[in-house]
Amino acid sequence: MASSIVSSMFLFLLLLLVFPHIDNVLGARMELRELGEINYADPLGFTRPIVPIHVPGFPPRRPTIPQLPPYRPRRCPFCYPPPPPKAFPKNSPSH
């Protein structure tokens, strides 16, 4: 019984902490919707696009990639069994 009281109190406190934030977000959305309907103009009268700063004379830095040695597969003596012996070898001594 004590655990249910503690869990319900925790849930209540969590709702108290979260609810004002949700209310602020919903209020901000409503304000943005109202401003969009009013067709609000910028007080300065223009908007300036953000342009990245480019310093001439410096080439862009290329990312450094570590150089790996070339991959050479090594022979594994236990991976493949030796071929079976031939039934009729070419250089067999004749009787």
UniProtKB/Swiss-Prot annotation:
Residues 1-27 form the signal peptide. It comes from the Eukaryota. Induction: Accumulates upon infection by the phytopathogenic bacterium X.campestris pv. campestris (both compatible and incompatible strains Xcc168 and Xcc750, respectively), agent of black rot. Accumulates at higher levels in light than in darkness. Repressed by MIF1. Keywords: Cell wall, Secreted, Signal. One of its GO terms (cellular component) is extracellular region. The keyword Plastid does not apply. It is found in: Secreted, Cell wall. The keyword Secreted applies. Its main location: secreted. GO terms for biological process: response to bacterium; response to light stimulus. Expressed in leaves, flowers and stems, but not in roots. Absent in the susceptible ecotype cv. Oy-0. Only present in ecotypes resistant against X.campestris pv. campestris race 750 (e.g. Xcc750). Maybe involved in defense responses to X.campestris, but probably not a X.campestris pv. campestris race 750 (e.g. Xcc750) resistance gene; according to genetic data, linked to a locus influencing resistance to Xcc750. This is Protein ECS1. It comes from Arabidopsis thaliana (Mouse-ear cress).
